Amino acid sequence: MSSTDTAARTASDSAALRAELDITKLHALPSEQQDLYLLTFTSDLVQHISGLEKPQVSAQQKFLKKELFKILTLSSPTITRVVRNNLGRCFGAIFSKGDRGILFETVTDLLGLLNAGKHEELKTKFAAAHCLGEVFAAAGESVFAQAGAVISSLLKLLKNASNHTGFRGSIFAVLRKVVVGVGIPVDESAARDIWKQARNAATGDKSTFVQVHACRCLEQLLNTTPFFDNANDFDHVKTVTLKVIDSPAAPVRHAAAACLARALAKLHATEAAVAPMPKSKKAKRQSKKPAPRPGEDEEEAEVSESSASKRPESRLFFLLPDLLRQLSTQYSRSGTSNRARAGIAVCYKHVLRTLGVKFVQERYGEIAGHLLFDLLNHPAVTYNRFRLLMTRKFVKSILEDTVGLESLREDSQLNAARWLINGVLKDYPQVIQERREPSKYTLTSTLSALSSLISSLGSAFTALAEPCRDALLQVLPHPSYTVRIHAAHCLRSFVLACPHQLLSCVTIALNSLNREIGQLSTPRQAPRRCVGYANGLSAMLSTSRLQPLYGSVEVYSRVFAQATDLLKTSSNSELRAASTQIQVAWILIGGLMPLGPSFVKIHLSQLMLLWKNALPKHLGKENFAQRGNLEMSFLAHVRECALGSLLVFLEFNSKLVTADGARRIATMLQNTVGFLDDLPKQKSVTDISQRLHPSLQLHDLTTMVQRRVLQCFSKLIHVHPLSHGDVISQTSLLSLAISSFAEPDSTQSGPLESSITASTAQFETLWDLSDNFAFGLTGLAREYVHVTLSGRHQNDNGPAWSAVESADQAIDDSVSFENAL
């Protein structure tokens, strides 16, 4: 035993000798090498302490403290951020691993450096303050008696740090660690002093670093002390955070959102906690105050409203509806910027995370109802197209990511899906007069949330298969295109999770489609209903290749025959009815293309003939002179539909594309380019009777055809690389691509565009032009935008340009992309 002790003591002594700083050697080095020497020494010291056992740390505490203070009091070189962080790690490791015999002495010595006169350099005080924060984070409960003195000294240093941004921010970071580390609420006067300084810094300081740490300091005061749970202080923190949340910097928005979320979550109370208040009713009867106007009582719910109360400040509580309304009211104000809305969306997420998993599971219906009905349907949101899309994205992130994936488990996910089906989808169309029909905005986000839950549950969703199938098929023919597409996507997720429902869903949708096609000549909304059923069928049929055991070749052949019959009989129909028949036929054919070469090969010759007929060689500009706007729109519409199915064919059947087939497809695409080149540049048509679709002009359809042509060209080149030279040399692909975004007259000038051009300073972004494509900018560039903003590719797990990537990056990206425009 004695030999072992001697060996351990020898190893300990040698380690101590290696950890000793040689100041003479340090100062003998050239000035440019002194920083590197000090950095290397402190890094080695961190590794040395991390490798020691608890008894070894206790044995070396005094020596290590001496070495650390030797570095803190160096006149040169300057203590950099990395060295400062290393010193803090050393102090934290010493008191978290070893005993705390020298803890009081260490805090006193660090306080002495903080309180030193002007003769002590600011960098030394900066390092001492940082080390104090690490000491309190590791062992603050053992020195809570000194917390008041430390807080007082740190607040005094704020005045001296007016010209040092990093020091100001670090002071608030240290104050936060002191408040958290002591383990008990700090003195109220000290807390009030921190509260005042942090509020002023959050709103008055221009540094984002200081603002972030000031907001985090406020958040910890709200979390660990009971002094600010009243109406007056809540109004103060709400005013501060809503002002800061409009910052262009995402970290500042997140810090302000977390602070406001902490305040709201701490003031949250269940009905059980608020209900038993008999005295408040009596006081309310005796009150002579006028009744509040509608909406004023929505701001807050106080437990006691008695004016005769002797307490100067009443305890404040929020029920869940009032708590959520605090956020939605501010979000829906017309003066709230999009950056502030993004911050409020992050605040929603923080509130739900703070309330806890169990609470969110129990109150999913109220939370989802607030977001889907109250927030999405507010006039301030629906009035502005970009604001609506942004809000839909925020609701998607909150409901699907924060709630659906983070909080809900399998049972609660099933309950949530049941609520979405019974509480929203089954109310369309309206059946009971007392239950309002959900708007298209509500239905869109509901279908998106349900699709996410179905994908997460997988085969466990079978318990809700029947009601879900009926609800989705009921929503599928909705008048809104957005709702129809989301319903089709949800049906795709549904049949993937419940493959035994595939054939029944396809059969029901196909029968409904045949019924609606027979009523195309009637005044009811049959065209939209037909396209809705076709999109649903296409989405469901495309899943057959993933689960072939549940499909049926007979059904596939029946659908293909139905599509070809529609193309053949469309020539006998009226123009608008024919356009619907053609669109439905090509959508169905596109849905069959994912079945792969085994099915498509049988019908390949017939498909090539159909595409050739739909994409013929154009006869020239003289031919257009005899056609009106309606007929030209029809020709563009036919080409866009045919190109859509051709694109899906190239995606899933590349093995069938031979060199001859590639040339034939390239010829069809070149024919379409010629058609686009000869289309006349017409202005917007106000006569609805001359439009193929009420909401689409001819130039809108032209843009859609251009998109499909470029997509098909791009896919063809990737599918058959040997045709690169032929495609580029024999077609005008490059001129089409360049003219799509470089041609000055590519956009058609209408009354709205002309008025905007005359007042260019009155709109914020290109989205306000309402030209449906923001002057050619497209979401297809999202990968480039993502790399530009975050510094990493989509599937890259390496470090990004930013050391800390936000957990709510989707919300930040939406605001960053808008600012880029």
Regions found by a protein language model. Give the residues of each.
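N-terminal "cap/leader" segments of large eukaryotic alpha-helical scaffolds
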Residues: 2-55, 69-70, 74, 815-817
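Flexible loop/turn segments at the boundaries of HEAT repeats in alpha-solenoid HEAT proteins
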Residues: 11, 15, 50-61, 95-104, ...
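Amphipathic alpha-helical segments within extended alpha-helical solenoids and repeat-rich scaffolds
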Residues: 15-21, 58-75, 100-120, 147-163, ...
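Structural signature of alpha-solenoid helical repeat scaffolds
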Residues: 33, 56, 75, 79, ...
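Long, compositionally biased acidic/polar linker segments
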Residues: 33-36, 40, 308-342, 346-425, ...
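HEAT-repeat alpha-solenoid elements in large eukaryotic scaffold proteins
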Residues: 34-52, 79-90, 121-135, 164-179, ...
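Helix-rich alpha-solenoid scaffolding regions
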Residues: 59-105, 382, 386-408, 412, ...
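A generic tandem-repeat structural signature
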Residues: 76-147
